[in-house]
């Protein structure tokens, strides 16, 4: 079984403090994957995130928060199971998670263009000797189409760094939507697609 609860509150009406609490068993799901919070029956705080405006931009800080939480993206596909990703195949770039303490900022222009960036670290010291992760994204969305591109770098601490480039896009027809994505990975000088 699994039990999730999301708590949300605001102090000013323009901000949001969100806390996710999870509990569940460690048995395999019908798709053959274990739940991400295999901890028996105890309650675990899965994430604490605070979102607030900074001028015309939106800032997100938190623990166990995705860097991509402020990324616009351009993928309309939504899976009905947890085993199938919702990121059009760009989960390491446009759908990048965080490694612990995270800060992310985005700005949306009136023209449909948006910019976002973030940094995350598994330690309390961001940009130290730990395996920090940072990424930037640019996106454009109109009524019936959109495109987004992202760059993510994971310095992996003392190991060779890994970089990701991802692009995804969508086009909306009258009866259906088409979403596509492509991502590349370079790990210590070795390219993968």
Model-inferred region functions:
Residues 133:
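Active-site substrate-binding loop specific to GH73 endo-beta-N-acetylglucosaminidase modules
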Residues 1-62, 66, 85-119, 130, ...:
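Beta-barrel outer-membrane channel/assembly domains of diderm bacteria
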Residues 121-123:
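Right-handed parallel beta-helix
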Residues 24-26, 76-81:
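Flexible, surface-exposed loop regions and adjacent strand-edge segments
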């Amino acid at each position: 079984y699994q039990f999730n609860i999301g708590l949300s509150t605001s102090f000013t009406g323009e901000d949001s403090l969100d806390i996710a609490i999870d509990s569940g068993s460690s048995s395999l799901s019908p798709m053959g994957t274990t739940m991400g919070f295999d901890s028996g029956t105890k309650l675990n705080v899965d994430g604490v995130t605070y979102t607030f405006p900074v001028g015309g931009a939106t800032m997100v800080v938190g623990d166990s928060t995705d860097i991509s939480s402020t990324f616009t993206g351009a993928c309309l596909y939504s899976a009905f199971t947890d085993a199938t990703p919702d990121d059009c195949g760009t989960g390491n770039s446009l759908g990048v998670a965080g490694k612990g303490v995270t800060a992310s900022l985005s700005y949306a222009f009136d023209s449909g263009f948006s910019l976002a960036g973030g940094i995350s670290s598994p330690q309390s010291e961001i940009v130290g000797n730990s395996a920090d992760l940072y990424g930037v994204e640019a996106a454009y969305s109109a009524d019936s189409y959109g495109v987004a591109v992202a760059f993510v770098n994971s310095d992996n601490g003392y190991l060779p760094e890994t970089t990701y480039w991802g692009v995804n896009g969508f086009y909306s027809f009258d009866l259906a939507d088409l979403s596509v994505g492509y991502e590349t990975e370079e790990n210590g000088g070795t390219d993968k697609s």
